[in-house]
Amino acid sequence: MLQNCAQSNCRIIPKKLRDMKREEICRLLADKVNKLKNKENSLSGLLPDVRLLYGETPFARTPVMYEPGIIILFSGHKIGYINERVFRYDANEYLLLTVPLPFECETYATSEVPLAGLRLNVDILQLQELLMDIGEDEHFQPSMAASGINSATLSEEILCAAERLLDVMERPLDARILGKQIIREILYYVLTGPCGGALLALVSRQTHFSLISRVLKRIENKYTENLSVEQLAAEANMSVSAFHHNFKSVTSTSPLQYLKNYRLHKARMMIIHDGMKASAAAMRVGYESASQFSREFKRYFGVTPGEDAARMRAMQGN
């Protein structure tokens, strides 16, 4: 498939032929993801930072919340929306999220062209070790990142490494021994590519990005509490106005809107996955009024909590 791809010199291959080869490679990788999905439960113990993505059902534009990670697709595509920003990720563009981020997403998938790929959680310790090995190399000069979500060209090097990762996942011993090293290789290519600054910001200290990331971690741990903008600004050691500006540059939304969206997503997970009643979920995430929660839930997701839960049950039944 991609055997010896590290040694191939794609620059001397005519573009049309190269694109045809890549398209065929991605189709084969999508098939491999589909086959591996049946083993995902056993694989999660061997490679906990890898999650396989596969689906044949399209989804209209809807609010989602992604945790930090790298998303690589081989088939199908998604379009994300954050305020005025629109970004597409597919077999040519990977997505990097460095903060937990609510946004709207549209999924394009069919049985003929499924959504297939993988998601890598970023292990901060592994990233720090990689940076220590790179050291003060003069060739490593990533630009600093301002946003928590970025996309970039899915290079031949990353695609080749992703293929080898899927390959070792077919054999438990290979997955356990070789998997983390291949993930490290993918991290290296992301770190030295266009999104390197965004990845570097995860372990940098005292930059605006790192300070806002610390605030987002506080929200993640304390979202049920009555958090004020003043408290969060103090956590970042910023004035309220500077905090607003820097928070929006990272998340593309205001602090209070982010907190509200975060609570709504957490409540939705409790309702859908834990079978919790809407009123109980509302109280659990910090709402004092169940009716206010239901209004804001419908305004954000476009359906009531009950309608959303029924829709998800129907989809799972199919």
Swiss-Prot record:
What keywords appear on the UniProt entry? Activator, DNA-binding, Transcription, Transcription regulation
Q: From the UniProt record, which GO molecular function terms apply? A: cis-regulatory region sequence-specific DNA binding; DNA-binding transcription activator activity
InterPro entries per UniProt: Homeodomain-like_sf, HTH_AraC, Tscrpt_reg_HTH_AraC_N
Where are the disulfide bridges? none
Q: Give the induction annotation.
A: In strain LY180, expression is induced by diverse aldehydes, including furfural. Induction may represent a response to physiological effects of these aldehydes rather than direct binding to YqhC. Probably regulates its own expression.
Can you give the residue ranges of the HTH araC/xylS-type domain? Answer: 213-311
DNA-binding region extent: 230-251, 278-301
Determine if Transcription regulation is one of this entry's keywords.
Answer: yes
> From its record, what is one biological process in GO terms?
regulation of DNA-templated transcription
Nucleotide-binding listed as a keyword:
no
Q: Report, from the record, the phenotype seen after gene disruption.
A: Deletion of the gene confers sensitivity to glyoxal. The knockout strain also shows higher susceptibility to glutaraldehyde.
| Matches recorded under Gene3D superfamilies | Homeodomain-like
Q: Name one Pfam family in it.
A: AraC_N
The protein's matches in PROSITE patterns, at most eight in alphabetical order, are given as: HTH_ARAC_FAMILY_2
* Protein's job: Transcriptional regulator that positively regulates the expression of the yqhD-dkgA operon. Acts by binding directly to the promoter region of yqhD.
Q: Which PANTHER family match?
A: ARAC-FAMILY TRANSCRIPTIONAL REGULATOR (PTHR43436), ARAC_XYLS FAMILY TRANSCRIPTIONAL REGULATOR (PTHR43436:SF2)
Q: What is this protein called?
A: HTH-type transcriptional regulator YqhC
